[in-house]
Amino acid sequence: MDSSTSLLPPLGSIILACEGLTSLVPLILSVLVCLVATVTISPTLLAYFNDPFELRAYPGPFLAKFTSAWISWIISQNRWSETVDLMHRQHGPIVRLSPDHVSVASPAAFAAVYGHSSGALKAPFYNAFANFKTRSIFNTRDRAEHSRKRRVEAHMFSPRSIRALEDTARVHFQVLVRQWDALCAPTGKTGRGSAEGTLGTISWKVHGDRVWFDCMPWFNFWSFDTISDLAFGRPFGMLEAAKGSAHVSKSNTKSVQAVSQDTSHSDEAQSELLEIPAMEVLSELLDFTVALAYLPAWVQPVFGRLPMFRDGYDAAPKLANLSLTAVANRVASQTDRADMLSELLRGRDEEGKPYGLEELSTEAELLIIAGGDTTANTSCATAYYIARDLQIQAKLQAELDVALDGVESDVAPYDAVKDLPYLDAVINEGLRLHSTIGAGLPRVVPSGGMTVLGQHLKEGTVVSSPIYTLHRNEAVWGKNACEFYPERWLEASADAKKEMMQSFAPFSMGPRACLGRSLALQQLHILLATIFHRYSLVLENNAPAQLPLRDGFARKPMKCIVGVQRRK
């Protein structure tokens, strides 16, 4: 026998050894499962019995006492706001949502948690929203950093700055009107004479004297094009194409080089483009992020790679690239055009420092998220309520007919509609019943604790107060709190109106309130006035009693089929 061969173990010995190991596999797996369970469950049970935040006395779902997985599961099922509201109806104004988190529901509680004197900071929940290393004004948890950003960005959303952008925004209202006019032509679409068809990605059909289509995508096309033009100097082109896609650079590196004003790469970055379904990407990313945000930080990367979260996980770099490409295109244009990015480029903090590449990119991404989705959601929901009640629609149209009599433009001028009592009431009611974010956004109780509704919450406790429940409080809004009733804003006494305003927070309140409030209100006034002055909208006979929603981070309408007709 060869000497080298004699050094090898006999084949039979190897087989026996392998068989021995194979027989141990079930035991090894059992040990591993026990170890994982011990590592996962032991701290949970220990925290429950130690009760470090003294929350055991507060009612809530059984699983919520032990784990944040309960609230994450509810969010992943698109039932966040409504489920928390149900918990409050069952258990009262204070409900436990996780081992360290309570939800408090009342006007006084909302002010205590989010008001200027609160002292509470944003919770670790917001860490999940960081798509860049540098935080945005939305997801930063540092008070000093937020104050610095607010000083730089507040001017961008001042009433004067917003009014200066009205002419730019008007273009996209005009495109929306042109597209809807084409759909409303006698044949349903210009010259075809067909009873049904498609315009871009939107299916339509003619039935009776109306054209029927889903209006939700149109509101998204409009809002994405408007914010991209106002922020970056050019629209994504969704309205013209009737398609929810945008073009991004194939290379993040080239986008970064362009944003860094390395002009040798600017043309190259713009020429190599990839089309992505931007609207879908944004929805997937928000659903993915908020579903994981309440889980422990070490769990999030693991869960993020599960098949059920794959689309959301893949959406993050796509949205980052969308913001990088938008900034790169704007920088490469070298225009002196006044827009939001020019305000960010000129902005300086108290030390005279401008925003760097990372900060520009993360704030650009926030503009796309906030401007591309939130106003569209509220617009669609409000249109749904108006189309559902033809008496409300007729009353609104009568007011608009007087206010816009003699106006030649197809688009309602803001000055002509900004102070119309019934339109204001309709918009307020839409924001009340369908504030884009209905859930309570979490804060951390500061040093020294916090007293809410007579209960002392210890330092480090996570606390939130849900807008959805605040806006449906029957003690304030009456027995018809869940109904769309604009007249409540006109019929209330001075004292009742004051109480209503204290319970009305569609843009939140305090130092972290939405900076884009003025822009959102301007856009809502122009959009709803333009649509309902020009068109009549109705719902299908078999329309759902409630607008179907994805109730995650944003309360996003899934579909809203309307029959549209040009008014005579």
Curated annotation (Swiss-Prot):
The pathway this protein participates in, as annotated, is:
Secondary metabolite biosynthesis
Query: What GO molecular-function term can you cite, just one?
Result: iron ion binding
Subcellular location(s) of the protein:
Membrane
What PROSITE patterns does the record tag this protein with? CYTOCHROME_P450
EC number, UniProt record: 1.-.-.-
Q: List membrane-spanning regions.
A: 21-41
Classification via InterPro entries:
Cyt_P450, Cyt_P450_CS, Cyt_P450_E_grp-I, Cyt_P450_sf, Cytochrome_P450_monoxygenase
The family annotation for this protein states:
Belongs to the cytochrome P450 family.
Q: What does this protein do?
A: Cytochrome P450 monooxygenase that is able to use trans-stilbene as a substrate for oxidation.
The name this protein carries in UniProt is Cytochrome P450 monooxygenase 89
Q: What is the protein's species of origin?
A: Postia placenta (strain ATCC 44394 / Madison 698-R) (Brown rot fungus)
